[in-house]
Every structure is written in structure tokens, then in C-alpha cells.
Amino acid sequence: MIQDKRDFGERILEYGTGLIKLVKPLLKTRLVFHFCLLPFALCLLTCFSGMASPINPQTTEPNEPSYLTPVEIKLSADGKKLYVLCEDGDSVMAVDTQTKQVVAKATVGHKPKGLAISPDGKTLYVSNEWSDTVTEVDAATFAVKRILKTGWGPVGLVSDRSGKTLYVANSIADSVSLIDLASGAEIKRFVTHRYPEQMLLSRDGRRVYVANILPHLGPYDQPPVSELLALDTTKQVVAERILVPGTIELRHIAEAPPALGGYLLVPLMRPKNLGPLIQVPQGWMMTHGMALIRPATTAPLGVAQSKVTQVVLDDIDYYFATNAGVAFSPDGRRAVVTSSDADIVSILDTARLAQRLREVPAEELANRLDSAVTFVVKRLPTGRNPTSVAVSPDSRWAYVTNRLDDSVTVVDLAQAKVASTIDLGGPKEITLMRRGEQMFHAAKYCFQGQFACATCHPNSHLDGLAWNLETPQLGRDRVANRTLRGIRETAPYKWNGKNPDLATQCGPRIAKYFFRSEGFNAEELGALLTYLNNIPLAPNRHIAPDGQLTEAQERGKAIFFRQSTNDGGAIPMQNRCDTCHPAETHYTARYSTDVKSATKYDTNGLFDIPQLDRVYEDAPYLHNGEALTLEEIWTVFNNQDTHGVTSDMSKEQLNDLIEFLKTL
């Protein structure tokens, strides 16, 4: 007689073991999962669902208090007001720098990410990433003046010196919109590379610089290359595409004062994704630093002649993950850089930095871990997740937004110490989900603080790389990073599908193979899983406001769900799109299959079926990132019809299929 649920579970496991032995010869066919293993899996879930678990994450969207989540900060020209942009508060506020009190607040669009001030200081421009708009706010009254349409996912923005044109970086659209401020209409659009976020107008007003978070799409077995786009504001053309090799995640941009030569400082990350990730020390997995760029403003348009030098901001035995915000003091003596996943702000001596650049060859600087000690004056603690920084006109004070603390850290640059903290008035209760987001951005859980979860998943997304993880056969089974958006109910995890749930994925696995530390305790892991289970999907820009599909999307939908080829031949069930990607389960059947995408470097051909929600944001594709676009999945890597039947399709049909996939 079965005494309790655990005894029953043991019997089920015995039955399952026998069943697997029985069907093992059939595992190469996908249908065996549906008819044999799936019922068994469901039975297991039913039997064990009531068992005690040390980790209890919330898997339903919690009723969260209205956190502010400050992400961007600017100073008025006279230094009397701080303008703070709050991502979750959907607001921009003004803070008096003397009283350190919030004195004004305006409600803007959804998920505001970027903030700019007009040349005359009378108008604030706020980009609303999920509304695809810019809110124009009167800086004196904080009244909303008008709302301007942009491209998809606006983040960074700047006005030209005349105040006539607004430049807006559209992160989802991979573009920059030029908006005529007299009419409020978009007059031009530039194509960028991947996920443009931060922007800067040069001091002379001749150029707008645009930093991209994700690297160029390229061969998965080659080092990444990121890009800083330079736009000519007079001719409104691309002036230069400045390449920054071996890097990803270009963040804020700061321009040095003329006395220092006017070089640009751009925080970045240098991933070491091509070598097996067998350790953390000595910057083995990644380092964090800056690009020093000397723009070639006199070079012919389109000719890349700017000089790029990289320098590491980490120490030999400790790292400062995810450099984000950067600013120079107006007197040029100091530069300030925030490390958002280390909760640190670093004060740099620019004279010593220049000396270091003279002493060490540029080709060495990018990987030298003994540089920062020569020019970092002080590392100061901030609140949680410092993102943006601004320096007062008198070069005395630096103001740092603490994204996950709803506060601003005030730094005394003269004495190199934290002077005070400005409370922006957010909720004091720290919910399980908020705590989980703090865990997600906490590099302290990694050995020597080298990285956090967010370091490889910027914006809770992906980094565009394929990583060479530690596997039994080192150097093989390289896998592409995957997005974390909308991952609830898409288990199992990993490309090999071996992690049955997020607790396994983010608990022992991360501690052993990534952090090389004790990792999270049960309470912390539960909070982290709550956050991961509630990462939302961004609005789908490919669907019309009324939800109706276009004619091309409807045709693509018919192709996705088709059961026969163009000549009337039946498509086997295991080779139909919706067999592996059923609509009712986020377009993933949640098991592994073989579509013959394995290369000679893979030890296994079975790979987890990815979910397709917002798949248009998830390039590169396939388990190793070989397919750079959705089209390449079939035009380059499906010549034998092993990944769905597509060889009979016309180019127009493939285009329609892609159009439908973008609606998911």
C-alpha cells in the first residue's frame, strides 16, 4: 500500500524509468513525446505539485506598489535643479539641489527612459519607450506641452544647438528619428545597428553620437564588434560609424572639456565568450571598462578615422560590473563612472588617466587589470543599481540615480566622499519581486563581483552573443544567449533542455558554473525567481492597434499552420511549424528536438524548442546563433527541410511567414 505522496512518487519514477527504456529507440521521432512522454510528464507534475519546496516564488503578477525607479538625471544650467526621470513611476520630477526636496513632478508616457533639455533650458524632452512617444514638458511649470510620435522604443534623445531638431534613438526599431520641433513631425530616420540607447550632442554642436547596447550581427565564433554612430547635424547625414572591437553594451557618452582634447568616454563591457568559461579570476569571463574615442571631425563623411582606445576599470582581484553612467567635471579634473551592478561610483583623475594612456601601448590597455589603480581616486558606495550621473557646474557635486532604491546619491568630489542621499519618495516596502530585481542586478554574488545576471541580460533581454560554456568536452557545444522576457511557463531551460525549472537554472547551476560562489540562498533565490517569472514582454509593434492582421500576416499565418505543401503533398506532423511551436503554450512545445542544426562542434543534436513571443527582437537565432536573421533560419540552414518544410516556398511566401512570426 502506498503510504504517502513520496512513496507514490517513487513508484511513478520506477514506472517512468521503465517507460523511458521502452521508448528510447524512438526518441529520434518527435511524436513519441506527445504520445508517451508528455502524459508521463504531466503525471509527474500532478503527483509532485503538492510536495514541500524550499523556494516559493510568486508566479502570478503581484500587486506591486508604485516604485519610481529613477533611470536618468540631468542638471539645469545653473545647477539649482535636478531633473530625475522615473521609469516605473512614468514621471519626471524636479529636485531642488539646495533643499534636496522634490519640488515638481509631471506624468509622462509609459516606461520613460531618456531625458533631454532644450538649449534655452525652458523645455524638457522625455522619451517613453513603451509608448513610442516623446513628452514635451515645460521646465518652469512642469505642464505637459505636447506629445510627439517617434519610432519604436525611444530611449536616448538630444536637441541640436539651435533647438529646432530633436534626435531620438529608437531601441526596438534600430534607428534614430529626426523630429522637426516646429511642426512636431518626424522628418528623417537613420538606420543604426542594434539597440541604440544613449546619445550625446558634441560641444561644438556638429555631431550627435549614438551608442548601441548590442554588437553587430556577425559570425558566432568571432569577437563581437560594437558601434558608436556619429551623425553630422549640419548635413543631417551619417558622418562616421566608429567601431569598438571586442565589446558590447556601450552605455552613456561623455565629452571631455576642450582643455583635455574633447575626447569621448563611453562605458562598455569586454566579454570573453569565445574561450571555455572554466573560471572567473583574471577577467576570464569578462571585464568592464571604457572606450576613449578621439573623433576625427575633419575626416571625409563616411570615413572611419576616429581613434579608439580601451581601458579596464576593474581591479586585479575585484570587478565593477556593468559600467553605465559617465560624466566629466566641467573643470576637467575628474570623470565619474557608475557601475550599476556593483553599486559603486568611481572617481577618476583625468590627468593620471592620460598618463596611463601614454605609458602603456593601446593594444595592451584593453586587457590590463593593473590600470585602474593608477587613475581611480576613490570608489564610493551608492544605492542599488546606479545608472546615470550628472556633475554640477562648479565641479563640486556629482549626483547619481539609484534605480532600485528610488534615491539619488550626492557625492562631494572635492573630498571624494558621499555627502548625502536624496529620497525621491518611493514606497518603503520592498516586495518579493522588487527584492528579486535587486538580486538580478547584484554582482556581489559572483566571485570577485565580476558580473550579475543583468550583465549578460541587459534590459532583462540578451547580449547578442554565443558563449562557450564549461561542458564535458571543453570548447564544444557553444550556445547563444537567450532572452528572459516572458519566460514564465516555457520550461525546460538551457538549450539542451536539462534544467526542468528556473530554480535549477538559477540556483545550483549559476552558483557552480557561472558565479563560482555559494550563489543565492533559498530566500534570495525565491525572490529572484519571482522577478524572472514576471518580466513582461514589450508591446508588439508589428500588430495594428485594433489587433487585426495585415493581408501579408494572414497569409503568413496560413503558411505557419499549413498541413500540405504547395503541390498538395502532406507535410508530416513532426515537420509542421505548429507541432513544435503550438500557439497555446507561447509557441513552444517545451521539449527538445533535432532540426539538424548541430555542427561538428556540437556533441548533441537535440535542442530545446524556443518560445517565439517577440521573436523579432531575439537575433541571432538557432542554438548557436549562426542564423543572423529570421530569414536565414530557412534560407541558409534548412536546405534539407529538417526545420519545417520550406523548400517549396516562394520568396513571397517566406516573406509572409516572417511577417506573421513578427506578430507573435
Where are these predicted regions, by residue range?
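Short loop/turn segments that connect beta-strands within beta-propeller blades
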Residues: 96-100, 138-142, 180-184, 232-236, ...
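Beta-strand-rich domains and repeat architectures in extracellular enzymes and scaffolds
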Residues: 62-90
